[in-house]
Curated annotation (Swiss-Prot):
Binding annotation for (2R)-2-phosphoglycerate: Q166, K340, R369, S370, K391
Gene from which the chain derives: eno
Pfam families listed in its UniProt record: Enolase_C, Enolase_N
The protein, known as: Enolase
CC terms in the record's Gene Ontology section: cell surface; extracellular region; phosphopyruvate hydratase complex
EC number: 4.2.1.11
Cited CDD domains: enolase
A GO MF term: magnesium ion binding
Major localization class: cytoplasm
Residues the entry annotates as binding Mg(2+): D245, E288, D315
Gene3D superfamilies: Enolase-like C-terminal domain (3.20.20.120), Enolase-like, N-terminal domain (3.30.390.10)
Length: 430
């Protein structure tokens, strides 16, 4: 194996994501003609502390959401720095882009520019070596297939309905393999669709493939999922658990949590009690962004009350950022981090966040964004780092299913060495 393979070309273009918004795609060409390609996702409910997604703001084109500035930054500035570099120097490649940007949040080049390049380089390197991406990133010990955290009922910013909490998910922890987990989840999804139809509910889907029915309360969404799990022939709390993503920053106004569908305005303490009631009543194993991103006091109360029995995931709270994560670890809030590549903007920084979380005994959940493409990098990443959990939407819409299908291929490729840890994934809760 040659240990120095030159990058000879870096090219970006504007493509469309799953919401008909422009996004960045990058191709990296190596000296022997090997090509790596990556496309960048985009979020709807974004944390205030995320790296900057550069948009053109030209209202005459794509409602101002064009990404030609980011494309230009790749083609005119990043390419010039990276051409001639060794594709295997991933850390140096990412460091070079950080230095070229020079801001704390990638506000100059755009995280959508740097991430596209970072991932395309990794893909090109893996392809040159004849390795799958998960093998290249993770090495010989990459073997754990993730428990899917499947969003099957949408509310909040992901749907036009009267449900406040953003995502209601299922986690098939009782499955013996990823393949079986996917089958179980798919069966529950179909059963839920039939159930909603029988109740006269709309079965149109939201951004992430989940259904978006108009329900009387957030709790009703949980109830109908439990009913679907049972009707599909599974046992809630044994075969399949429930996970929530309230996206609480979106409902946090003037220091209070506004549950409009239920006519409730709650303090931090009351919001925690609201979750405690739900956890005591239903088989809920994980809650993401239960409190707002700057409600550190609320997070402390929540972690004290539920931190030993429920996975408490920080998304907007941590934004895949080691500085934010370190603050959370020091304050002893949450016990898990959501990993979104585009929140931070390079592969190296993403891996650093996962490593810091694991050292502190926090679990990591690798995640998509609501605006996705056919790019399957996160499927390889979750296996590469043995994270054990992936959040990539319902088993519907091809930009979501692409990730699940890639995981099926990886499980097949790993054969007998593949592990699906199920309930053991949640090693830091009882």
């Amino acid at each position: 194996m040659r240990n120095y393979v030159e990058i000879v070309d870096v090219t970006a273009r504007q493509i469309l994501d799953s919401r008909a918004n422009p996004t960045v795609e990058v191709e990296v060409i190596l000296e022997d003609g090997t090509e790596g390609r990556a496309a960048v996702p985009s979020g709807a409910s974004t944390g205030a502390f995320e790296a900057v997604e550069l948009r053109d703001e030209d209202k005459e084109k794509y409602m101002g959401k064009g990404v030609l500035k980011a494309v230009e930054n790749v083609n005119n500035y990043i390419a010039e720095e990276l051409i001639g570099m060794n594709v295997f120097d991933q850390v140096l490649i990412d460091k070079t882009m950080l230095e070229l940007d020079g801001t704390h949040n990638k506000g100059k080049l755009g995280a959508n520019a740097t991430l596209g390049v970072s991932l395309a380089c990794a893909r090109a390197a893996a392809k040159y070596l004849g390795l799958s991406l998960y093998q290249y990133i993770g090495g010989v010990n990459a073997k754990v297939l993730p428990v899917p955290m499947m969003n099957i009922v949408n509310g909040g910013k992901h749907a036009d309905n009267n449900v406040d909490l953003q995502e209601f998910m299922i986690m098939p922890v009782g499955a013996p393999s990823f393949t079986e987990a996917l089958r179980m989840s798919s069966e529950v999804y179909h059963t839920l669709k039939s159930l909603l139809k029988s109740k006269g509910q709309d079965t149109g889907v939201g951004d992430e493939g989940g259904f978006a029915p108009n329900l009387n309360s957030n709790e009703e969404a949980i109830q109908i999922i439990v009913e679907a799990v049972e009707k599909a022939g599974y046992v809630p709390g044994k075969d399949i658990f429930i996970a929530l993503d309230p996206a609480s920053t979106e409902i946090y106004e003037d220091g209070k949590y506004n549950l409009k569908s239920e006519g409730k305005v709650l303090s931090s303490e009351e919001m925690v009690d609201y979750y405690v009631t739900l956890v005591n009543k239903y088989p809920i194993i994980s809650i993401e962004d239960a409190m707002a991103e700057e409600d550190w006091e609320g997070w402390s109360i929540l972690t004290e009350k539920l931190g030993d029995k429920v996975q408490l995931v920080g998304d907007d709270l941590f934004v895949t950022n080691t500085e934010r994560l370190k603050k959370g670890i020091d304050k002893k809030v949450a016990n898990s981090i959501l990993i979104k590549l585009n929140q931070i903007g390079t592969l190296t920084e993403t891996l650093n966040a996962i490593e810091m979380a694991e050292r502190a005994g926090y679990t990591a959940v690798v995640s998509h964004r609501s605006g996705e493409t056919e790019d399957t990098t996160i499927a390889d990443l979750v296996v590469a780092v043995n994270a054990g959990q992936i959040k990539t939407g319902a088993p519907a819409r091809s930009e979501r299913v692409a990730k699940y299908n890639q995981l099926l291929r990886i499980e097949e490729e790993l054969g007998e060495t593949a592990e699906y840890r199920g309930l053991n994934t949640f090693y830091n809760i009882k």
